[in-house]
């Protein structure tokens, strides 16, 4: 009896949770990342992204020991 009650409550809650998360995941910004050996920080990365024509700038990220400059598309 308790299992039926619990499952009848949990399933609708999971559906509502999924409906809330779907727009969040779908609306994420896409970025193009390039290896940033020459860049030393965020200012250089933002300048490079501005030169490439992006309006939102960029961010430096370290991944597997390399520094990447990611420009928002």
Swiss-Prot record:
GO terms for cellular component: extracellular region. The keyword Plastid does not apply. Its main location: secreted. Residues 1-27 form the signal peptide. It is found in: Secreted. The keyword ATP-binding does not apply. Keywords: Antimicrobial, Disulfide bond, Fungicide, Plant defense, Secreted, Signal. Pfam families: AtDEF-like. Disulfide bonds join 33-71, 45-69, 49-70. It comes from the Eukaryota. GO terms for biological process: defense response to fungus; killing of cells of another organism. Belongs to the DEFL family. This is Defensin-like protein 87. The lineage of its organism: Eukaryota, Viridiplantae, Streptophyta, Embryophyta, Tracheophyta.
């Amino acid at each position: 009896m308790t299992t039926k009650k619990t499952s009848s409550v949990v399933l609708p809650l999971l559906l509502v949770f999924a409906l809330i998360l779907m727009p969040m995941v779908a609306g994420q910004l896409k970025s193009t990342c390039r290896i940033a050996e020459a860049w030393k920080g965020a200012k250089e990365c933002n300048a490079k992204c501005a030169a490439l024509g992006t309006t939102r700038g960029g961010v430096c990220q370290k991944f597997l020991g390399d520094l990447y400059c990611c420009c928002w598309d």
